[in-house]
A protein has these predicted regions:
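Mature, well-folded catalytic/scaffold domains that follow N-terminal targeting or propeptide regions
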Residues: 1-376
Length: 376
C-alpha cells in the first residue's frame, strides 16, 4: 500500500491513532470521505481469511463510497459510516498486496482466451498477465467475462462471486481507479479456486426466458440464503445496465434460475403486506425516525422504511445508512445489512423492474432481515 496516514495506521493496526483521526474528522470539515475510502481499497481488496467467507467489506465500502460520491449522505452520516469502516478494517485480516499497470513484454493474440487457458491450469500469475493485456486492450470484454465466471460459479458461494465483485468492477475497474489492477488480481485470485474449463463459453449458461415473477420469487423468504436471491438478481440487472456491458454478451441466468428460483414460491404474507395501505406517519427528522424505528415490530418498521422511501429517497438513503452504522457492534456486525437495503433501494431508484409489488417486497425483505439479525 502506498504511504498515507490512514494506510499506515491500518498497517500498524493502531487503534489509538484511528480514534484520534476520527476525532479530528469530527471537528474539521475539510476532508473527503471518498478519498479516505480510496486509501483503504488496496487492503480491503485483499482481505485474508475472509471473515464472512467472501469479500463483503470492500463491497460495503464501495456501496457507501458511491452514495457519498452522489451526495446522498449527510456529513454526519459520512462520518458515522467511516467510523464503522475503519473499525471493521482494523478488526479484519488482510495482506499488503498491490498491483499496477505495466508495459507487457509479450502479448497474446487473444488475451481473454489465453487468460481462460491459464485459469484452467490454476496458473494465477499467467492469468493475471493476460488479464492486464485484456484490460489495456478490451476492458469492457474483460469485465463481462469475469462477471460471467462469477455468475456461473455463484451457486457454490451464494452468489458472492458475482455480487461482491460487481461493485468492484463498477466503481474501481471500469473507472480505471488506481486500485484497478489490484482489483483484477483479487478477482482472479478468487476465481482461481474453481475448475474453470479452457473452452469456457458464456453462451452455455444463458437463459432468455426468465419468468415475469422472478423478482417476487427472489424477494420471498427469510434468512441469509433468501436475501441472497434478491441480492443476486438485482446485481444481474445492474450488470445489464452497466456502462461496460456489451448488450450482446449473454448473462448466465440459467444457473441462477435453476439453483435459486426454479423450486421457490412467492411469500403470500410479504406480498399481502406490500399491497396494503402503509398507514404509517413519515417522521419529520432523523431523531423522530430513530424513535419510530421499532426493532421488535417487523410489520411497523418495514412499512416505515417503505413510507420514508416514497416520501423522500434522499432521506431514506441518509437516515437508514446512518441508523445502521450507529447500530454497529464490533464482532456482531453483518455487512449484509447494508448490502440488502442498498440493493433494494437501488432496484427502486433505478426502476430496474416494472413489478411494483416485487420492488416493494425487496425493501420489505431487506428490512425484515435486518430486524431479525441485528444485535440490538
Amino acid at each position: 500500500m502506498k504511504s498515507s496516514h490512514l494506510q499506515n495506521l491500518l498497517l500498524r493496526r493502531d487503534k489509538k491513532a484511528a480514534e484520534v483521526l476520527l476525532q479530528r474528522l469530527g471537528k474539521d470539515e475539510n476532508w473527503s470521505a471518498v478519498s479516505l475510502i480510496d486509501e483503504m481499497l488496496p487492503g480491503l481488496l485483499f482481505e485474508a481469511n475472509l471473515t464472512y467467507g467472501n469479500f463483503h467489506q470492500v463491497k460495503m465500502a464501495l456501496y457507501l463510497r458511491r452514495l457519498i460520491r452522489e451526495n446522498k449522505l449527510s456529513r454526519r452520516s459520512e462520518l458515522t459510516v467511516l467510523e464503522l469502516l475503519i473499525e471493521e478494517t482494523l478488526r479484519r485480516s488482510w495482506v499488503n498486496i498491490e498491483a499496477g499497470e505495466i508495459a507487457l513484454a509479450e502479448k497474446a493474440e487473444n488475451p481473454l482466451t489465453a487468460m481462460l487457458g491459464e485459469l484452467a491450469e490454476n496458473n494465477l500469475h499467467n492469468a493475471f498477465y493476460y488479464a492486464l493485456q485484456a484490460y489495456q486492450e478490451k476492458p469492457e470484454e474483460l469485465q463481462d467475462l469475469l462477471l460471467c465466471l462469477g455468475g456461473v460459479y455463484g451457486p457454490e458461494n451464494l452468489g458472492h462471486s458475482l455480487s461482491c465483485f460487481f461493485p468492484v468492477l463498477e466503481e474501481i475497474v471500469n473507472s480505471h481507479n488506481p486500485a484497478a489492477e489490484t482489483a483484477i488480481l483479487s478477482y482472479l485470485s478468487y476465481l482461481n479456486r474453481y475448475d474453470i474449463p479452457a473452452d469456457f463459453s458464456p453462451e452455455d449458461y444463458q437463459k432468455t426466458d426468465m419468468p415475469e415473477n422472478s423478482l417476487r420469487l427472489a424477494a420471498s423468504g427469510q434468512g441469509i440464503v433468501n436475501l441472497h436471491h434478491m441480492i443476486t438478481l438485482v446485481t444481474y440487472w445492474l450488470w445489464e445496465k452497466a456502462d461496460f456491458h456489451d448488450k450482446n454478451f449473454p448473462l448466465p441466468y440459467r444457473i441462477y434460475y435453476q439453483k435459486r428460483l426454479a423450486d421457490k414460491g412467492i411469500s403470500s404474507k410479504r406480498l399481502k403486506r406490500v399491497k396494503e395501505p402503509l398507514q404509517v406517519e413519515v417522521p419529520g427528522s432523523y431523531e423522530e425516525f430513530r424513535q419510530s424505528f421499532n426493532y421488535d415490530n417487523i410489520d411497523h418498521t418495514t412499512r416505515l422504511i417503505r413510507a420514508l422511501w416514497q416520501d423522500s429517497q434522499r432521506k431514506a438513503w441518509d437516515w437508514v445508512c446512518r441508523l445502521y452504522a450507529e447500530d454497529y457492534e464490533p464482532g456482531t456486525w453483518n455487512p449484509h445489512f447494508f448490502t440488502g437495503i442498498y440493493l433494494a433501494f437501488r432496484l427502486n431508484e433505478e426502476n430496474l423492474s416494472d413489478d411494483k409489488s416485487g420492488k416493494e417486497m425487496a425493501i420489505d425483505q431487506a428490512v425484515e432481515y435486518y430486524l431479525n439479525s441485528v444485535n440490538y
